[in-house]
Amino acid sequence: IRTPGGAAGQIVGGVTQLYDMMATCFELAGVTARHTHFARCLVPQLDGTPGDPHRAGFVEGGYNVHEPECFENLPLKPEHIYYPKIRLQNEQPETITRATMMRTTECKLVLRPDGVSEFYDLQRDPRELENVFGHHTYAARQAAMQQAVLDWNIRTSDVTPHGLKDERDMPRDKLRVLAPQKT
C-alpha cells in the first residue's frame, strides 16, 4: 500500500495476512467495519513501526474425500497449467483433505484430520523440504502450535451478524448483566 506522504519502499516485516489489507484500507479511508473480523491494521507498520514478532497467520481450506462434488474435472490437455494439480487430487484425494495451517516466522504447522499433517522449522528449512511432524525435537513447539490452532478456531469460528434485532425485546442492559463483558 502506498500512502500520501508515507515512507517510500517501506516493507512490513513479520507475518501478515491478506485480510489485513481490508483493516488497513478501512483505517486509511476512515471507514468503520460493520462486521466482525480478525484482521489487523498495518498503518503503523507503513510508517515504520515494527510489527508483532510473535504474530501467527492462520489458513483453513480443502475438502473431504467424501465430497467429490468439490473435485475439479481433469482438463483435456496435459499441457494445461493446472493438469498436474488436478490429476493429483483425482488420483490421490487424500492430498487435498481439509486442513488448518498456522505459520509464524519460525515454524509452520499444517493439521489434516484425514491425511498427512506437517511441521516445518522455517529457520532451518525455509523451503519446507523436511516434514518433522511428530519428531521429538519439536514436540513442545508442535504442541503449543496445535493448542494455538484450537484456540484460534474457537475464537473465530462462529461470529454473529451485526445489527440483528433482539426478537425477545429484552433491554440491552439486561443482556449485559446476563453476559458480562471482559475487564
Task: Write out the residue ranges for each language-model feature.
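Non-transmembrane alpha-helical segments in soluble domains
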Residues: 19-26, 30, 43, 120, ...
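A structural signal for well-ordered alpha-helical segments within the folded catalytic domains
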Residues: 16-23, 37-40, 96, 104, ...
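Short secondary-structure transition/capping segments
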Residues: 57, 81-89, 157-165
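Long, internal low-complexity/basic segments
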Residues: 62-66, 132-183
